[in-house]
Regions:
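Alpha-helical multi-pass membrane segments and their bilayer interfacial helix-loop junctions
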Residues: 1-294
Length: 294
């Protein structure tokens, strides 16, 4: 039996040293502090809305937003600190849009607010090249499309179906770009979570759309089915090529959930029988998945 390598070099590769822990805690606490500050501002307005005059409502948000931008622009702080501060300022933009809409009762739909928020965020995302800010931008863009779908598009129409699947392909395109950047070395290893989160969002969203289409008789099934087959095939091929356990595990599991949804929605069995056979499908499929992967 071979002995495990317990040399200092091996331990150094596995465990973080004191300097790395200090750096992690500094960044983590800074991000949490900025997040709680922005959340505190939002709850402050929610609690004191009736007591604050219009000037104070708009003035507080604008002063904080301008101060954040000035600190990012004219200070010599660490680049990461500036990026986190600018990400916090991005949420202040959304707060400003919401406050303005509530004060003057503009009558705008929710997707209008998120559309304006998205447009004002894209320049900062491009300029800073900061993964959390890019994630915020992609999330805002997808939320805008979904809100438009819910409020404007007709239920189960081609417009709703195509726009919903457009969200899937936005996440897929972002995944492809970040995977390519990671392969070419243009993406920091510390941002690998960003790639995994985008790919997870792509898989979950296309699976969700397909399961919804399966459960609703009047829904258009062809578009989400084609998207799911194409994306699952491409990601399985890529996962096999680069030996990525993430893709090889999550896609078969998503396919298992789609199969289970199809069985439940199309079967005429009683609840107890559905529960029993559904459990058999999940246990059998999960066991086979673990056996194949390991």
């Amino acid at each position: 039996m071979e002995k495990t390598d317990s040399s200092p070099l091996s331990r150094q590769a596995l465990y973080a040293d004191k300097k790395q822990w200090n750096q992690f805690l500094s960044v983590f606490l800074l991000a949490v502090g900025v997040g709680f500050t922005v959340a505190g501002i939002i709850f402050f307005f929610a609690y004191n809305w009736d007591e604050l005059p219009k000037f104070a409502k708009l003035g507080i948000v604008e002063v904080l937003l301008i101060a954040s931008v000035l600190l990012v622009t004219f200070t010599r702080w660490n680049k990461l600190v500036k990026q986190i501060l600018l990400t916090g300022a991005t949420f202040l933009i959304g707060t400003l849009f919401a406050v303005f809409g509530q004060i003057y009762q503009t009558g705008a739909d929710a997707y209008d607010l998120f559309l304006g928020w998205t447009l004002f965020t894209i320049l900062w995302a491009v300029a800073t090249r900061f993964a959390p800010l890019w994630l915020t931008f992609i999330g805002l863009l997808c939320t805008t499309i979904w809100l438009y779908n819910i409020q404007i598009a007709n239920t189960n129409s081609w417009e709703m179906t195509l726009l919903a699947n457009a969200v899937t392909w936005i996440c897929a395109l972002a995944t492809i770009i970040t995977e390519w950047m990671s392969t070419k070395g243009h993406l920091d290893r510390n941002n690998r979570w960003f790639v995994s989160l985008l790919s997870l969002a792509t898989i979950l969203h296309t699976s969700f759309l397909l399961m919804m289409a399966i459960c609703e008789e009047s829904a258009i099934l062809s578009v989400p089915l084609i998207s799911t087959v194409l994306l699952f095939s491409a990601e399985l091929w890529y996962g096999w090529k680069v030996k990525s356990l993430f893709y090889l595990a999550i896609i078969p599991f998503a396919a298992l959930m789609i199969l289970l949804t199809t069985f439940i929605s199309q079967s005429n069995l009683r609840d107890v029988q559905i529960f029993f056979y559904g459990g058999v499908i999940v246990i059998t499929g999960t066991t086979l998945l673990i056996y194949i992967i390991l």
